[in-house]
Amino acid sequence: MNQTMGGYSPKELTIGTESQEKLLHGIEMISSAVKSTLGPMGQTVIIESPHHTHGLTVTKDGVTVAKSYDMDDPVGNLAVKMMKEASSRTATAAGDGTTTAIVLTEALVKEGMDRITGDINKTDVLRYLASETELLVRD
């Protein structure tokens, strides 16, 4: 039976733990690709790119790697898109730190997921993250 949501019939409905796992997987995948470029010992990445010489782009720039990354799974790709947006905003605002922003976001999300799946009050976790974020931004 296909249920409609506000007149819209979804192709696929993903809820609960399954959606959390898919979102986390998307974050882990883009972070894995990007974090390999981190720091002075970071690795060069080769990206298939029809717009460049011989169809390839060779880069050590995390935001370039992030922008080129996509997933087939629409839920995982939603997380990838959010990470791309965060890295692009970091690049625009600071001019650097895109790879670090993605790696830190992955760590925060993983820690948050560990807390949420435990016996801790989810609202308390969100309040704590909001207060810590405010302190970091202020300092």
What positions do the PLM features span?
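N-terminal glycine-/lysine-enriched basic segments
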Residues: 1-139
